[in-house]
């Protein structure tokens, strides 16, 4: 039975879809059968990050409305064995998702995959509750800024109140991914520290992604950064291994200038 992992955030633009794409590839390359599902109706971009935008014929709404069957809508990634992708609808009504139809879809996917990664709409946009409803695990992506942390705190509360596991008295395994960390700014007191982020959100940390220009370059090429050898790629690889239950040594990010590290004892 598949594990449903919802990747979510309190606001848009924090790297949620990029994280979904890279972790999907990481899990697939670890030998797991993975499907990445884009639930961000009207604002899809997971397809572009995966480099699959030109292969979309049917989308998740087409499946729910029975315009096609599930196998017709699933796109297999030719570059990554074991990875499939189901696109969000680009032009249909954001409110088109239906609780019963979503449940049918997720149950069908559970039968065929080891991991279902759901790219959730940000915050409490339409479709968010559908994206978190079936989550076994939730990865909350934040950036070290006040607005991101405030909105993510609200999202965590909704997961704890409205997911199926929460309603049945079980826990959704929630973890924090801190994205776009700039150690120099932390050292100078210009960016919220890792300690403060963890204190505010009270979630276990599963990884830190450093600010990295390679991510922009890779995204523009439709080549997820995890396939490269840069620091952000290594960070995504470590997160992947932790999702799989491995005990992975944590890495300390240091400021490039000077001897002071604002992250001493804090890990990625």
From Swiss-Prot:
GO MF term set: ATP binding; ATP hydrolysis activity
One Gene Ontology biological process: negative regulation of cell division
Binding site for ATP: 11-18
Keyword Cell inner membrane: no
Compartments where found: Cell membrane
Pfam families (alphabetical): AAA_31
InterPro entries (UniProt xref): AAA_dom, MinD, MinD_FleN, P-loop_NTPase, ParA/MinD_ATPase
Keywords on record: ATP-binding, Cell cycle, Cell division, Cell membrane, Membrane, Nucleotide-binding, Septation
Topology in the lipid bilayer: Peripheral membrane protein
UniProt keyword S-adenosyl-L-methionine present: no
Regions that span the bilayer: none
Any one cellular-component term (Gene Ontology): cytoplasmic side of plasma membrane
Role, per record: ATPase required for the correct placement of the division site. Cell division inhibitors MinC and MinD act in concert to form an inhibitor capable of blocking formation of the polar Z ring septums. Rapidly oscillates between the poles of the cell to destabilize FtsZ filaments that have formed before they mature into polar Z rings.
Quaternary structure, from the entry: Interacts with MinC and FtsZ.
Family to which the UniProt record says this protein belongs: Belongs to the ParA family. MinD subfamily.
Protein name: Septum site-determining protein MinD
Gene name in the database record: minD
């Amino acid at each position: 039975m598949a594990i449903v992992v919802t990747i979510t955030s309190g606001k848009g633009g924090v790297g949620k879809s990029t994280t979904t794409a890279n972790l999907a590839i990481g899990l697939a390359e670890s030998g797991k059968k993975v499907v990445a599902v884009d639930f961000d109706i009207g604002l899809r971009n997971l397809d572009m990050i995966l480099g699959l935008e030109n292969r979309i014929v049917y989308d998740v709404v087409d499946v729910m409305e029975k315009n096609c069957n599930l196998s017709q809508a699933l796109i297999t990634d030719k570059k990554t064995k074991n990875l499939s992708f189901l696109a969000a609808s680009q032009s249909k009504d954001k409110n088109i998702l239906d609780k019963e139809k979503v449940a049918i879809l997720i149950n069908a996917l559970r039968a065929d995959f080891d991991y279902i990664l759901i790219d959730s709409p940000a915050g409490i946009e339409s479709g968010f509750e559908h994206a978190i409803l079936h989550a076994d695990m939730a990865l909350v992506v934040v950036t070290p800024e006040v607005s991101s942390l405030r909105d993510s705190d609200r999202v965590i509360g909704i997961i704890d109140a409205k997911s199926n596991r929460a309603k049945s008295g079980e826990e959704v395994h929630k973890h924090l991914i801190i994205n776009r960390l700039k150690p120099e700014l932390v050292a100078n007191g210009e960016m919220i520290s890792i300690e403060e982020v963890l204190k505010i959100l009270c979630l276990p940390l599963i990884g830190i992604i450093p600010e990295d220009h390679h991510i922009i370059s890779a995204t523009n090429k439709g080549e997820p950064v995890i396939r490269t050898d840069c620091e952000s790629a290594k960070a995504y690889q470590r997160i992947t291994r932790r999702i799989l239950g491995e005990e992975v040594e944590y890495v300390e990010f240091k400021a490039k200038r000077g001897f002071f590290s604002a992250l001493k004892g804090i890990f990625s």
